[in-house]
Every structure is written in structure tokens, then in C-alpha cells.
Amino acid sequence: VNWCPSDQTVLANEQVVDGCCERCGAEVEVRELEQWFLKITDYADRLLEDLDTVDWPENVKTMQRNWIGRSEGAEVVFTCDELGTEYPVFTTRPDTLFGATFFVLAPEHPDVLRLAEGTGNEQAVAEYVKEALARGSDLRGAAEREKTGVALGRTVTNPVNGEQIPVFVADYVLMEYGTGAIMAVPGHDERDYAFAKAFDLPIRRVIEGDNPDGDADGLPYAGDGVLVNSAPQFDGQPNREALKEIVVWLESEGKGKLAVNYRLRDWLISRQRYWGCPIPIVRCPECGIVPVPNDQLPVMLPVIEDYAPQGQSPLAAATDWVNTECPNCGGPAERETDTMDTFVDSSWYFLRYCDASNDEAAWDPAILREWMPVDQYIGGVEHAILHLLYARFFCKALADLGHLDVDEPFARLFTQGMITRDGAKMSKSRGNVVSPKAIVDRYGADSARAYILFIGAPDQDADWSDEGVEGVHRFLSRLWRLSAEVADHDAAGAPVGDEAANTELIRKANWAIEKVTGDMDRRFAFNTAIAAVMELVNEVSRLRDSAGLDAQRFALETASSLCFPFAPHVTTDAYHLLTGEQLWEQPWPTADAATLERDTYELVCQVNGKLRDRVEVASDASKEQLEAAAMAAPNVQVHLDGREPNKVIVVPGKLVNIVVG
């Protein structure tokens, strides 16, 4: 199992990242311990197939598919004739079997030390295994690592050609994938090739193909081609066709069979910590391992004085709690002292939320039928192969046991990004943490809140910028100032304004309603929603002298309503200034579709990316007509100064950018 020397506890495979503990960063070791597992592998296919039934981000689905890692291939049996033992190997490339020139076992393989007995290599093998187990599997499996290993002094028989090939123990082979044993084909596998070179082992080509990046012989070659140096009945065939025939032949000879393998391993839930749910098991000298009966659940944690990590569970010291009676025979027994990984609790907490006050059961099935599955779940992508996978497994297992009517917990998933600073995750150790109090004291809570939502797409990481907060602060100040100015006008004597300006401002306000509502509804695109309100406020500023007071008032009321979720304080006050009413009592605005229809629109005209003019154009104008209108704009003509454009970029409905040298 994976062992964290800092936290003094075991870790699930999913909690090891690049060979280190995902919680504290310590380099993970491998130890042999008796631990408890949940058999998540029984659900591997369903966990894969049902990803197609949920509305989740594709990257999260891909991460789960890769973690489950379903592979179709063959199980081939190699035999150590000296000891009479068989060693099955899973391979997705049975077409390369004739190229196997050595055999490798993972350091954790139970037969490594036994195979070395009596060969004179016992000590070297034992020392190598000890060193290898101190390294995490994430680091060991890296393709770029220097290959190390020790010969066991034994050979096994290659079942397809009868060759005796030497057996090694090497840490680049992982026990958690396949059977912990591999047939090494250095001519067609990069890691096997590196090992063969390091130990001067034979390298044989069995697939003919072109590899300009290989050695002088074009090896290692991992592509497709035709079989060579294999067997007369297979040589000359395309390797993908021969692959199927080789498996059929192996089955007929009793030397192999079709097989499916998974990268996923059973979930190790034992933890040597105090804080966790006690594992409800007792150990009886007479009855063995006995589950705690339902009427004695839950097993409660005892009160202890010292729960610091000690290499074994702190509960082991609570002898009054450990010593108990066997539920079967009534004799003396001991409780299991490991506790469950806290991911066990987070795998079903959402079910308890539906019926949190129930003192008789975890939940009432009728209540869960009404509430489950969760319609919208929000969480970090870092939980893709941890909490999100475990929760799916729990729901499927509980459904199979008759406790649930649904087997997928979360119908829709949204994964939020992280706000970084100077390109790095904020942390006290890096000294790059932004103080919320300092931001609020300087710019106000609304500016801080709105900027966090405006900083970028909510599902992407974004870098913090103090200048960005200032920009949002200026926008909110402008909204307040314009609202105060309009509110100060006497409505009775207010100017009617230019009809075209009024129409444009009302249209812009309704466009903002439609845009913000759509962005917030399902996409959570708060950044573009805020940008739309900014556009509306900018339009009020631009048309301040030409639009009538009623149009300006409507636009500013709309801006306050739309910005209320992002900046509730200033918008509440601005709306009250304009209307005398409380904003939180108002319904969400709805767009008037009729105002959004128009025969013309204002085309932005740029020269070298800078705004130089605006012209009114027909809504159905072609790209050629838009280019001609922009070229004829008076201020564009001034800045062109007789020069011919190098390039003209036309974006219908928005702008024309004329590029000149």
C-alpha cells in the first residue's frame, strides 16, 4: 500500500500525485500492510458506461475514463519450468509476443524473493526490492527515468516460440497494472528498449515499419506494419490482423485467452488516524473477522488524549474501547482500530442532506425519491478521480442494495477555476495571498465581489490583478454617479431627447437583459454578464447629451437590476435613487423582443485596431458593403491619409478594422 511518512497513514492510489502525498507533499513509500478495501472494481464497466448519461464537463469524463483505464487484450501464460510455476501476463499487444526477449516482475510481486532463492542473487534482489518499495509508483513508472533492475537468476518459457528468456525485477513495472508481470518487447516498447540497452539484452524487430526517430534500425517502433521474425503462419500479415489470429491460436493451445484489464484498483479505505468513521469490524480468536451487527451501529469514536500520527491508529491505545465482545460467540474480541478514509463520508453526504433531521435512519427513501439526483453540482476539477468517482460508486452500490432509486448522484456538474496570483496558487508560504479585508477597505465589498466574478471565465483559472479591481470600482462609481445625476433631474421638465438615441439606448438595455439572463442561467458566465452591464452603462455615458431622461432612467434601472447579484449594495442604493423602491422586491427584468429588432446598426470603424469612427449600416449588409462603408467614414479617411490598406478585417454586426503600414 502507499504510505505517507509525514502523515503516518496509508493513502489510496488516487491520493498520490507525482509520487507525493496530495495533502502534505511528502514522498510516498510502499509498505506491506493488512488493510480494508471497497471493491469498486466490480463497478468499473458501469462507471465507464454511465458517464454518457450525465451532463458533465468532457475533461472530467475523460479523466475518469483514463483513471478507470479499460484495456482489451490477451492474458498470456509464461512458465518457469525450473519451479513449475505459471505467470500470466496481460498485454494489449499479443502481436509482439515473438519479440519478447526478457521477462520483468514488479518489486511488489509475491514471487520475486521466492524466484531468487538458491540462485546466488537473493541478497541483491532483496536489497533492490527494499529500495524500490521506498519510491512511489508514480515516480517509478515515468518513461524518462533511468531504468534499474536485478536479474533473478531464473528463466521463463515464451509460449509462442518456446524460447527461454531471463527474468528480472525492475521498478518500472507496477503491481497495480495488469498482473504485476510483463513480457518485455524492447524492439517495440520505449521503456523495455531503455532497459534492454542498460542491461545489454537482445532486441528483436517483429513488426516492419518506418520510424525516423528510432535508432539505426528504426527501433523502438510502436506503430503498425507487417509481422516479421515471428512464425511462418503470421509473418507478412498486417499486425492488427495477426493480433486476432495469435490470440485464437493461444486459446486453442491453452496458453492464453482474450482478457479485459482495468487501471482502476479497489479503493483502500483504511486510515491510521483518529478522525474518521471507525471500521465496524471486530476480530475474534474463535470466529475470525466479524462485522458489527446493524443494531450496534454506528460504532462511536472514544475520547482519547493523544491522536497525533504514530504509525498505527491512535485508537489502538484506547484499550477500554478496543477490548469488546464478539457479536457471534460472546467471547473476548478486539475492535478494528483503523478508521475510514474521510472520502467515504463525502461519498454520501448529499443523500443525508435530503433528510438531515431523521433520527431513525440515514434517510427516508420516499424523500430521496423526490430530491435525488442532485440537479446541479459545483466543485473543483481536482476531485475528478476522487470524490466525484467515489460518489458515483456509492450511489450504484446503494441502488443495488435497494436503498436508492437512482445510481448517478449528480445530473449536471460545473467545475470552477482557481484565482491565482503571479501565475501561482495563492498560499501563505509563497506570500502571494490577497487580503480580502484590504481590498474591501480600499474599494468596498461590491468592487471586490464583482471583480472576482468578472476576472475570467468561471471554469478557467484566472490571475488576480489589483488594476482589475480598480477598473471594476470605476465602473460601479460611474453607475452610481449617472444614477444620481438622472435622479436629480425634475421629471416634469426633463428633455425628451433625440428619438434615434432613445431607441438605441432602450434597445441596448433590452439586449443587456437578454445577454445577462442567458449568461447566468446555465453557463454561469458571470464575467460576460458583467461585461454586458458595463457596455450598457458606457452607452448611457455616450448618449448622455442626446438621449431623453426617460430612456436614460430605464437603462440605469436595468443596469442596477442586472448587476444586483454581483454588486448588491451600490445597485440597491442606485435603484432606490431612481425609483424610490427597493430593488430586492422587484422581479428579474425581461427583455422586450420587439425592441431588439432593427433595420440598421452602428458599425465600429477602426484603423490599426483603434476606434476612428462609427457609421450606421443596414443589418443585412454584406462584407463588401461593410468594408466600403468603413473606408468612406470621414474620420477613417483622415487617418488613412491616402494610404492603401494592407488588410481589412470585417466582423459583421460589430466592426471593420483597416490595417495600414
Task: Specify the residue positions occupied by each region the protein language model found.
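NTP-handling and nucleic-acid-processing catalytic cores
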Residues: V1-E208, Q310, P314, E325, ...
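A generic secondary-structure signal for well-formed alpha-helical elements
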Residues: L11, V28, L51, D55, ...
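Structured ligand/cofactor/substrate-binding pocket environments in proteins
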Residues: V60-R65, T91-D224, K255, A259-W267, ...
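Glycine-rich, small/acidic residue-mixed loop/short-helix segments
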Residues: T179, E616-G642, N646-G653, N657
